[in-house]
Amino acid sequence: MSNTGSARTEEFTKGTGYEATKPNNDTDDDAKQNYPSKEPHMKLGDYTEETSFVDDSIFKREELTPDRNSPANDVEKMEVPKPTPQWMKLKDEGKLGKHRKNRLRRPGRFPVRQESTIDIPGLTVSKRTENDSNNASYGIREKLIIILVGIPATGKSYIGSKLSRYYNWLKYNCRFFSVGDKRREEGASTYSMSADFFDIKNEETFKFRENVALETLEDLLHWMIHENGVIGILDATNSTHERRKHLYDRISKEADIGIMFLESLCTDDILFEENIKLKIKGPDYEGYDTESALKDLRERVDLYKKYYEPLDERDEQLPFLQYVKVINVGIKVVTHNIEGFLAGQAVYFMLNLNIQKRQIWLTRPGESLDTVAGRIGGDASLTPIGKQYAQDLANFMDRQRVLWQLRYTNDLASTNKRFSLSEASSFNVWSSVRKRAIETIEFFNPDSYNVKKIRLLNDLNLGSREGLTLREFSEKYPDEFDVIKRKDYAYRFSGQGGESYLDVIHRLQPLIVEIERSSGNILVVSHRIVSNILMTYFLNYHPEDIIDVGLPLHTLFCIESDRYGTTCMAYRYDAANRQFIKDPMFDLRKRT
């Protein structure tokens, strides 16, 4: 290249902070800020095999003559950019912290870690290698390990189990690995598991606990690598930076597995005491009386508090590390460096986490003309019996609402809980936008209930098969009809608007999160398949049970959920006597 071109380039870049040589040590601070790297800027010939990702030959073609008409040769005519004024510069501009430098990707054709993008089962497909043809995870390429952090009785296991249920319901292959379960399995015959067992000064038990934690991690890694796992949740206290770094270093040896710490902190004394009373009902205190269990658990908590190291700047130094701090089971959420799609889903869920006790009622629309004719789908109105069901449903819910408020008031008086009574009076009524569903909620007073029609609650769209009877469907399209029996959740029915089960699941995702967020009671009036999908989530059924769960016509289900667990009660409608009768023996998995 000509010297003239170099001179023009030097003149063009002069004063912009992009000169091709490093400034002298006696330059002013502003000039130094333009050179965050300790190494001189590279010239065209200074590249190395480590940093080069382009064919070397392109730098050796000096015989090529530049186009004289190119705008690049009019550099003298171009206005030289002015330096950035000092007042416009960021406080730490040019001074990347160590943890920020670790996130930069090494130049090259193959980056060290590929960026995570959207992965939704049944809706996205990632290109996979020939040796990774198993479709059990529906083409999900990203993998994530969530490591729980926190002292006992802060709610971390509760949060982890809720996350596991949420991911599995969305059809991500997720599994919960409990270090405590493995500790009890391997050490119950040797150790007493009392508070002294958890003392970090007890070298024997400390070594045993460390080994159990690493063994559990190895089980998790084996499952993710060899059994098509997508998300693994490691449940343990992981209370020191040294332990967390050890886990991080081991996981980092495996390719393309994201790591996220999830720390649960509890600063609310009332909530912490409730967690303490809940934890003594767990397997660590089987055979203990209440007083002895409380005493031992408090001693264990005091030991952990003495040595506990919360997530801080030291953890942030670990390359690519993501973490979430959940304070008081979702009252406050703090995040750091959340990049992956799967990690983002966890944060989204944490922001809507709610431990308030509440009722979730589910029912199908009343009997419709299409129901009588045996047709699937469609948009028919209710029959006279269906309208009667709608009227009696509203009356029954009015009575149940009063009973709930009485229970709630008594609960507040007896336990001094921290929630306000006004929350007990909140009641939402949702339905799909189909005629039969809208007519089923017709008798709910909008002045007393928050009534909404939501298109997301529409039933599975069978495309061109809508309006057929089951017999017509099975005879004309036996292959598609067999899809239901084969439980192919990714199969999308043909015809305009046709959906798959996975389409419906992800269509319902924002409603699930909204129900999790809401502190009030709710009645959902939707259709058979949608109701099945909702029931499998709230009752934590296996994801493959979606098709097997049966919600009969004119049956009402009440789910009561809080951090202590979930209960479900069925009420059958007696049309002759116009009343709902509690049925404690009803089995959801038996189709009726």
Curated annotation (Swiss-Prot):
Active site positions: D235, C266, H527
EC number(s) on file: 2.7.1.105
SUPFAM superfamilies documented for this protein: P-loop containing nucleoside triphosphate hydrolases, Phosphoglycerate mutase-like
Keywords (A to Z) from UniProt: ATP-binding, Cytoplasm, Kinase, Nucleotide-binding, Nucleus, Transferase
CDD domains xrefs: HP_PGM_like (cd07067)
Main location: cytoplasm
MF terms (GO), sorted A to Z: 6-phosphofructo-2-kinase activity; ATP binding
Reaction equation(s) it catalyzes: beta-D-fructose 6-phosphate + ATP = beta-D-fructose 2,6-bisphosphate + ADP + H(+)
Database matches in SMART domains: PGAM
Binding site for ATP: G150, I151, P152, A153, T154, G155, K156, S157
Extent of Basic and acidic residues compositional bias: 57-66
One Pfam family per UniProt: His_Phos_1
Signal peptide: none
Region entry Disordered, spans: 1-80
UniProt GO BP: fructose 2,6-bisphosphate metabolic process; fructose metabolic process
Record GO cellular component, one term: nucleus
Binding site for beta-D-fructose 6-phosphate: R300
InterPro entries from the UniProt entry: 6Pfruct_kin, 6Phosfructo_kin, His_Pase_superF_clade-1, His_PPase_superfam, P-loop_NTPase
Compartments where found: Cytoplasm; Nucleus
Function: Synthesis of fructose 2,6-bisphosphate.
PANTHER family the record matches: 6-PHOSPHOFRUCTO-2-KINASE C222.13C-RELATED, 6-PHOSPHOFRUCTO-2-KINASE/FRUCTOSE-2,6-BISPHOSPHATASE
Name used for this protein in its record: Probable 6-phosphofructo-2-kinase C222.13c
